[in-house]
């Protein structure tokens, strides 16, 4: 089996397992394999998109593909694992008189200092690196952390990746109590 045929089959089989849907080999060749080839020598990748748009699916496909064909270790960080605790978000909501911060998701509800620390340590290869794991059922971090000891490609995925929160001054000046 040629390398291109192996990559086509692997990608198609992986997408079926991840999504339950069959993607044509033409679409895989024209889109997925081009993207995967383009990423081969990258060290970092940010994937942003709305909820349910396929960020996690694409991240897992990249991880599996890179391990199989390039022997590279891909680490996937989800911005979701860096949410502030429920208590911290409620405190922000009271402080700024808006319930926007009570729910997860909007810019300003993540622990960006910890995210920067973790990503910097991963990029500097200061292993091991411990990554928080957020439990959406309890709306708080789990009691354990994921241990990472190697990274060749770091993927950060989330729906507001790179978005900046509205300034606190602006929020105070435009209090509406949403």
Where are these regions (language model features)?
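Conserved nucleotide-sensing/catalytic segment adjacent to the nucleotide-binding pocket
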Residues: 84-132
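Conserved small/polar residues in nucleotide/adenosyl-binding loops
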Residues: 169-176
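Conserved lysine of the Walker
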Residues: 55
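Hydrophobic positions on the alpha1 helix immediately C-terminal to the Walker A/P-loop
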Residues: 58
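Short beta-strand-centered segment that lines the nucleotide-binding/catalytic pocket of NTP-utilizing
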Residues: 72-84
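Walker A (P-loop) phosphate-binding loop of P-loop NTPases
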Residues: 52
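Charged, amphipathic alpha-helical linker segments immediately N-terminal to NTP-binding catalytic cores
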Residues: 1-25
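Glycine-rich phosphate-binding loop used to anchor ATP phosphates in small-molecule kinases
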Residues: 114-168
